[in-house]
Every structure is written in C-alpha cells, then in structure tokens.
Amino acid sequence: MSTLDKNLLLEMFRKMEEIRRMDLKIAQLVKKGKVPGMTHFSVGEEAANVGAMLALNEDDLITSNHRGHGQAIAKGIDLNGMMAEILGKYTGTCKGKGGSMHIADLDAGNLGANGIVGGGMGIAVGAALTQQMKNTGKIVVCFFGDGATNEGVFHEAVNMASIWNLPVIFYCINNGYGISADIKEMTNVKHIHERSAAYGIPGMFIEDGNNVIDVYEGFKKAVDHVRSGKGPVLIESVTYRWLGHSSSDPGKYRTREEVDMWKEKDPIENLRKYLVENKIASAEELEEIQAQVKEAVETSVKFAEESPFPPLESAFEDIYAD
C-alpha cells in the first residue's frame, strides 16, 4: 500500500474527477454548437496529467499542448475562467482569445497550450533557461504526445536542454496514436523514453500511466533529479484516450474491443477502489467529492453562458507585452 498522505490521494481523486467531468461537459457543449474551434479531450488520460502535476511545486512552470484541458485543470486553473475561455467569452482566462487549443493561465504557471504539434518544446526550453539564469529554483515541464516526438523541434529542444543542463522535464503522454497513426508504424524504438540515450540524459518509463500513484512516484524522482541541478529528463507515460483525436474524429481506426479494454483500466475507478478497499477513504467521502465537482462544473457552464463575448475593441488589446 502507498505511503502517500490521505489529503494528497483525495486531491488526486478530485483533480481527476474535475478533468473527466469538465471534458464530458465540454463535449456536450460542442454537440450543441456552443464551442468555437477544435477541441481535444483528455478523457482516459487523467492519471497521467494529475500524477505528474501534483509532484511539482505550485510555482513550477509548464507548457501544454492541443490536448491541454487536463493539464490546465491539474495545474489549478479556475474552472469558471476555463469554461468561459473555451466558449470564447471575455471572462475567460485569455479573454476568449485562446479557446480550447491555446488556453493559458500564467497565474498558475501554465505558459500555454499550443495548436502546433511540438510547439511548446522551444517555449519550455526558453522558460527553463530563464529559471537557470535567474536562479529561481523552479523547474519547467513540457507536456506533449507521442506524435510530437517525430517533429524536428523535439530533437532541437532536448539536445539544447541537454547541452545547457537546463531544469526541464520533457514529458511524453503516450496514448498510442498520433491522430489515426499507430505509434508502432511511426517509430522503430520500442519505447519513446529510450531516445534519451541519444542526448546523454536519463529516460524514465511509467508503464501504467493510468495508475495515478505510479505516475506521481515516478515523476517525483524526475523532479528531484532536475531540481538538484542534474539536468533534464525525458519521461514516457503510457495511457489511452477514450475519445477520438478531436471533437470531429469518430475514431474508426480503433476497434471497439480495444477501447473497451482500456476503459477497464479507468484511472478514476482504479483510484476509487484503492482508496475504499484500503480504508483510506469511505465511499461516502468520495461521493461527496464527486458531488462537489459536479456542482462546480455546472456552475462553470452557467458562468460561461452568462458571460459576454469580447467587444470588438478588444481585438486591439494584448498585442504587445507590457
């Protein structure tokens, strides 16, 4: 049994519930035509996001990717502001200009999601260089999917971070598919983290990315390594997205049997069973958390729907940095 604190375990459960319920609610709003632009959901990948994020200090920084809802929530974004942003409202965290794929929350240390595959990697290296030069003690985590590891910027970013011994973790959430392309067709290495050897940095493998405790404990080792000044780490966590690549993808390249098999590994249900069976938390405690999260999500929808769209003059705001 894990020695992790009960409060931490309950926070894991709460954050995963927030991600699941927010994404499913957003999916409903997409079908109603209320969400402009593309959306990419994190359903099924909750543990891979939450376990990693809770291993960080609150003031550490991240860069996200197009499938960034889970990362934003795990990093502590205000749910009202997030929902408003996704609906394109002026009360959103980016005043409605970012939407689903470009959501950012600088107050929480989220430097932003990115619609360009691998687009956050150079930003993460730059942010890590800043922390090193200013001696802040903060580290940066760059979130990306398996498909991004075949982009040229992956090589450039990891190589530069290695040369300069930067405080950055490159975190690959491997869900097995780059849109519809099976990872086995895209690379000859068995595991993506093995590529770390080419850059002279450690590679870490979290085989069960649906086990939030495994993710947390594995990630904590990487965090300690980087924060102690030993340089970057490449981590790979294996998980699975239940839904299509995006809101427009029916996922016909996967079999129903494959999806159902992974749903049996539901990260939230796995943690719920663990907490109850080991008498860490009662079923009633967890149901109360679920009820609180459900209410918070409904409140976020009400807030977003009642919020105004950006005024025309706001198009000329935020063009230059202060």
Describe the role of every protein-language-model region.
Residues L166-F170, P202:
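Short, proline-centered helix/strand-breaking motifs
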Residues L24-A27, K34-W164, D182-N188, H193, ...:
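Cofactor-binding active-site loop characterized by glycine-rich and histidine/acidic residues
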